[in-house]
Amino acid sequence: MKIKSVMTLAAATALLAGGAMAQSGAQSGDWRTVSPENLWVIDTAKGRVLVELEPRVAPNHIERIRTLTNQGFYDGLKFHRVIPNFMAQTGDPQGTGAGGSELPDLKGEFTFRRGRDSGFAPVENSGAGLRGVMGSIPIVTQPDAQMFVTADFKTSAQGLFCPGVAGMARAGSPDSANSQFFLMTGQNDNLNGGYTVFGRVVQGLDVVRALKAGDEAQDGAVGPDADAMTRARLASAMPEAERPTIRVAVPGSAPFNAAVEAARAEKGASFNICDVQPPVQGG
C-alpha cells in the first residue's frame, strides 16, 4: 500500500456569513473545542501527535480508524516510510508497506458534499474553485451559489494535501485503502483527488517532522530502526482527567483571519491555502 508517487471571494464570504456553522465539537465565539471522539491521540517515540478526525469528509475511513484504534491495532507499528517535506507513513503490521488489517478494503472517499452550514471560510480564489478551510481541513469547493441548483442543496468539495493533513494510503486501486495512513509534512498537489483525506494534525506536526527519515534511494523506506507509534487512542477512550483538550480557531473568526493575513504577508505572491495553519489552543 505505497503512495504513488464562478464567484468572487468577497461575494462568497458574504453568502457564507448568513449560514449557520455546524462544527465538530462545542463552539464558543472564535474557538471550537474538538470533540473527544474526533481527537486521535498518537503517542510516538518522538512525542505526542494530536489529529482531528473529520467525519464530514470521509465517514467510512473515520469509522475504520476508530475501529482499529479501539482494537489496539496501531500500537507499536512503525513509521516505515518517511520522506522529509512530504509525509510519514505507518499503519502496516508488516512494516514494509504491503500489509494491512483483516478488515475489507475501503472505497475511496475523495470528494464529499458540503452544505451552507459547514462553517467553510474561503481563503484563496485562484484556478478552479474556492480554496479555504472547513473545521481544520483545507479544501477546494464550488461556491455556495451552486447549492441553489442542486437537488440536495449542497455542493462538491475535496480535501487538499497540505502540511498536517492525514490521508489514507492505498495500492494501485483507488478502492484499496485498509489500515495504512500518512501524515503530511509538506504540500503535494499530486495527491489531491486520488487519496482520501480524513483529518489533520492540530498539534505535534513538529513531532512528525522529527521522525526518523528513510533512504531517498529506497523511496523513503526507513528500516528496522524506524520510530513507532507506542500507542494510539481516541481521546474519548481515555480517562477524563487524562484527555487532552484542543480548541481550534473557527474559520472566518478574528484569530483565524489574523493567521491567514500573517501567512499572506510572509509568503507574498507565492501564498496559497497550504500556508494556512488554523490557530490552536490547549493540548
Feature roles, as predicted:
Residues M1-L9:
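Bacterial N-terminal signal peptides that target proteins for export
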Residues I3, G19-G283:
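Cyclophilin-like peptidyl-prolyl cis-trans isomerases
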Residues T8-A17:
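Bacterial N-terminal signal peptides
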